[in-house]
């Protein structure tokens, strides 16, 4: 407890020295941030490239620690009292505070600094060697050198690297906001608590432990802002008030004990990829998208009136999105994408059986495996949903095992499925009418109006992706708002991930607005 008190005292002292009084008639927070950005665009792009050059896969313990230390030092340089928190066997959590004298509202800021694993062979450039393009690659953009001081930066240019969109962009945007405030004497209207997660892409398995171990550090927070995710598919900025939960399972079916010559044994030995496809087809209609697992939709919590109204007000963009993605149809038509995201989903996220392409051989594969991705909505429990899927597999006549079957098991059961995985976390949702959330909506709406025109902000009941936000509503008992800034076509989780520079500029403006929003702040 002494450590926590000392940290708060140091943060308060630093803030008092950091923020000088602002003369009457001075620029607003967003104006100060915009002026700073316009004068330093080239340097900001280079700083972003430096951040992106730090490898950040959670399982790479050496580099993930280097990344955490770099971010800690960058936060410290702009006046945040930052340090690394530790629990056994986990990447460090970057924690920081900025205490504002007289502030009566405390905002928590969540960002994750880890990224998805990479396969360099799939990338046009090395994933941790950031490369600037004049436009998106798909729009015939060309690679260019990072800008020198004074050089113009085209807002339509894009920087390509792992985590450019998910989720280092918020870090690259919040740092110049705090630096601009420091240099201009602008005082935030809220105390700030920073939490940077180092294993979100791995499911944040230690986040609960961090929240419980250091509970006193999070208790002052009134509202959590989650800086993660993409803009609406229409390109308009959005706020989201919920996220889907997630879980994964892996299913393997078996034939012979080894791969067999397809000439000698084909048309006789079990064709395991086809057997697996039949099992998967029994789980879901590939055209309607309906999951056929009994009870899959039974625990879905109905949307409230405010969520239904928000859904009805969303811009119609499905047809344009289909054209952009080269699709003539979608699952569940005529339901919209936004409506479909309000339901749990089952996706076949990967399949393996022998080899393809240049490595293909004339064999009957001895086994075939599918990785299942299941997204959850409010009301779904991960363990319960796993149980439903396993019950469905058993109804198809399978004996379920947890390890590869031995010969005795193979000769006892005709149909065997190894089922593993199943961890994950539930969905979370906050009320859009919460007073603190209404403050965020007002500030974000003003920022969106300035950048995109009046009425541009989209309010979405829940993001399609997943974040462990249930820990903040269920463990810390605090509301949250998700504040996405990445372009919707940022290739999140895929090769050639990127960020459109205009989205970085908007993030700077938006964060400046949130950090200086009125009501409930300075007394």
Language-model-derived ranges and their functions:
Residues 152-242, 522-523:
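Acidic/histidine-rich catalytic neighborhood of metal-dependent amide-processing enzymes
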Residues 103, 233-234, 292-367, 375-392, ...:
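An extended, acidic, His-containing surface patch that forms the Zn2+-binding/catalytic region
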Residues 8-21:
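Bacterial N-terminal signal peptides
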Residues 22-26:
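Sec/Tat signal peptide C-region and signal peptidase I cleavage site
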Residues 113-115, 195-204, 227-232, 255-257, ...:
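Acidic, glycine-rich active-site loops and adjacent beta-strand->loop/helix elements
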